[in-house]
Amino acid sequence: MEKIKIIVASDSIGETAELVARAGISQFNPKQCKNELLRYPYIESFEDVDEVIQVAKDTNAIIVYTLIKPEMKQYMSEKVAEFQLKSVDIMGPLMDLLSASVEEKPYNEPGIVHRLDDAYFKKIDAIEFAVKYDDGKDPKGLPKADIVLLGISRTSKTPLSQYLAHKSYKVMNVPIVPEVTPPDGLYDIDPKKCIALKISEEKLNRIRKERLKQLGLGDTARYATEARIQEELNYFEEIVSEIGCPVIDVSQKAIEETANDIIHYIEQNKSK
């Protein structure tokens, strides 16, 4: 089956349209709904809209758009109707309803939700921090972090760091590997901001075997053997015991659920 092409078009960064598109895609079997997102942010002219229309015509793409300026929105609407293209106006119907409800015209300013206020800068800083200090790259990040995640391989440290960063938490993650001594600074920071991520031996074994298959390798590699996994788990327990930090079992939890548990713990202990 050919990939479904979706054009995300916006007169701002396009984050809202992309989130809605991805939310819709997530409701379908990925094997049956293979997709490709094409991004067209900062649309400012009719020529920009024409480019989107041409690509949609050439690729039979669905256009998902958030255009705030009335003239841009109207032009897009006319063009998709003219060429009978598949499209979804994310913001238009909602803004029309709100305008009618409050009997007031909207600002019609693209990107107003992303005004560069303190909260926005804090979020960007947190995202950059998570990238810079991913996988224990630099121990200098330890005292600067709001949260330090510890765990062996395949315990979702990186996606959790990114998820929490989007909640404006500066997160550093540190891999726990028997052959690598944890950074000295790990024992100097407040253990209340450390979270250890635990996973069951059975779940980890399945994940690692699947990972090896994806890499085209046999599932008998030492990386996925029970002996190696048990060695890593034992070492993990030893390090966590020395630090004295809380442990969250991620074996049966989604990223969002684990992140919420972490946030709850961190916020509870801020004032203690």
Curated annotation (Swiss-Prot):
It comes from the Bacteria. InterPro entries: Kinase-pyrophosphorylase, PPDK_reg. It holds the Pfam family Kinase-PPPase. Transmembrane segments: none annotated. ADP binds at G151, I152, S153, R154, T155, S156, K157, T158. It catalyses: N(tele)-phospho-L-histidyl/L-threonyl-[pyruvate, phosphate dikinase] + ADP = N(tele)-phospho-L-histidyl/O-phospho-L-threonyl-[pyruvate, phosphate dikinase] + AMP + H(+); N(tele)-phospho-L-histidyl/O-phospho-L-threonyl-[pyruvate, phosphate dikinase] + phosphate + H(+) = N(tele)-phospho-L-histidyl/L-threonyl-[pyruvate, phosphate dikinase] + diphosphate. One of its GO terms (molecular function) is phosphotransferase activity, phosphate group as acceptor. Keywords: Kinase, Nucleotide-binding, Serine/threonine-protein kinase, Transferase. Its EC number is 2.7.11.32, 2.7.4.27. Belongs to the pyruvate, phosphate/water dikinase regulatory protein family. PDRP subfamily. HAMAP family: PDRP (MF_00921). Bifunctional serine/threonine kinase and phosphorylase involved in the regulation of the pyruvate, phosphate dikinase (PPDK) by catalyzing its phosphorylation/dephosphorylation. NCBIfam families: PRK05339.1 (NF003742). This is Putative pyruvate, phosphate dikinase regulatory protein. It comes from Staphylococcus aureus (strain JH9).
